[in-house]
Amino acid sequence: MEIQLINIGFGNIVSANRVVAIVSPESAPIKRIITDARDKNQLIDATYGRRTRAVIITDSSHVILSAIQPETVANRFVISREHQSVEN
């Protein structure tokens, strides 16, 4: 299996193979997930001080905050998958 990487903004890159969900941070359950991850030292803040617009949840229970829209991250995820299938 080849490693696929997704740019989540400001030069930060995440392994696409480890992503479970890309969600918006506005709902109360997602805010609780962020708080729990912060308490467990499993939160990665990749916003560079900007407003959090996307929350990426990984299979290792790490939570990554990004300053770009969830739709943008999802589109990059899909493009990455399509690019790999074209190469094979």
Swiss-Prot record:
Lineage: superkingdom: Bacteria
InterPro entries for this protein: RemA-like
A Pfam short name: RemA-like
PANTHER family: REGULATORY PROTEIN SSL2874-RELATED, REGULATORY PROTEIN TM_1690-RELATED
Family: Belongs to the RemA family.
Name this polypeptide is given: Putative regulatory protein asr0105
Organism, scientific name: Nostoc sp. (strain PCC 7120 / SAG 25.82 / UTEX 2576)
